[in-house]
Each structure stands twice: as C-alpha cells, then as structure tokens.
Amino acid sequence: MHPIWTCLVGLALAGVAAAQTTQTPGDSRLLAQQSLQAVDSKEHLDHPNWLGPFIPTPATVVDAALELAKVGENDLVYDLGSGDGRIILAAAQRFQARSVGIEWNQALCEKTSSAIQRLGLEGRVKVIQGDIFDQDVSPATVVTGYLLPKSWERLAPILERQLRKGVRVVSVNDPIPGWQVLEKKQLKGESKTASWDLYLYRIR
C-alpha cells in the first residue's frame, strides 16, 4: 500500500476509535463509513459483497461476545469481517480456542498477520484475505461478526447451509434478520449514550 494511503487509513481508524467513546454505535458506524470511504479502495466500496466499514470493537465487547458464546479450548472460532484481528486474537489468547478470521482488506490482513507472528500464535490463529461469500466456514463451532443487517441477511442462508447443528453465532449490535435470538446482552459504553448489543444464536 502506498505510504500516503497507509497514513490516511491510520488517521481514519484513529478517529473512529476516538469517536467510539462519545458516539452511539449507530453514530460511530456512520462516522466510520464516511471516514473509510475516503481511504478504502474504490473496488471494495463498489463491490456488491462489501459488508461495511471496519469499526474497532472495544476489548470489553470482544470478551463479552466470546463469553456469550461460551468459547473454550475445544472451539474453532470464525470471525466474519475480522478487521485488525482483535476477536480471533482474543479467542486464542484469552479463551484458548483456535480461530480463523476472514477479511478482504489487505492492510488489515497484514496487520493481523503481524500480530499473530508477534504473539506466537501461528499454530492456532490464521487470517484469510478474501470474500466471505467465497469461503467455507463449515469447520466452525462458533461464528462471530460485526456486520450490517443487509450483510447478515445475505449471509444467513449460507451459514444455515454450511454450519453444523449446535454451532453458536454471535452478532454484534444488529440482530440477524429472520433468526430466533437465543440470548441478548447489552453492554454500556464509556459514555452515557454509548451501548453495545450482542445477540446469540444457535444453528438448529
């Protein structure tokens, strides 16, 4: 990636992270989309399978999502739209699970790969750069994602076909259209107006 684009991506993501402490998730999502549209490639933004902007999820929300799914050492966690890898790294580091991230942004994949190597997690964590709609997620025992509702709507039938009975699915902030919520958890953000919703599902 060209140095100027790397700089712009860093500035945009820093702005989004700062906004998380003062905005609601909906406001932060809008801010992120406006910021990242200036730096994400035209090819990505115009692609019909673009799932939405990368919005950094706070560590407390990451842990809560994995706890809600009762992730443990026998699990294989797939994170759809894994961003900078914070969920798949946490799954391995703090929950002793194996994990796979799927992300098509090259810069974010490179950042994740660097973190995996730095933390010595090569045997338990990997990131795949590619289109989620082209991937096989059938090995997963847990699936997580922070996606737009329209993206979940398109992914839902794919997950229903590929995932085995009993697999847990956690959606951050938006419910999956047409799916029955098994459990919902709300977390308060750092500001009075910020909150995060987690939705747990189980494949039947």
Predicted segments with their positions:
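Bacterial N-terminal signal peptides
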Residues: T6-G15
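S-adenosyl-L-methionine
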Residues: Q20-D75, N105-P139
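Conserved SAM-binding motif I beta-strand of class I
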Residues: R98-E103
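C-terminal substrate-binding/active-site "lid" region of AdoMet-derived donor-dependent transferases
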Residues: K150-R204
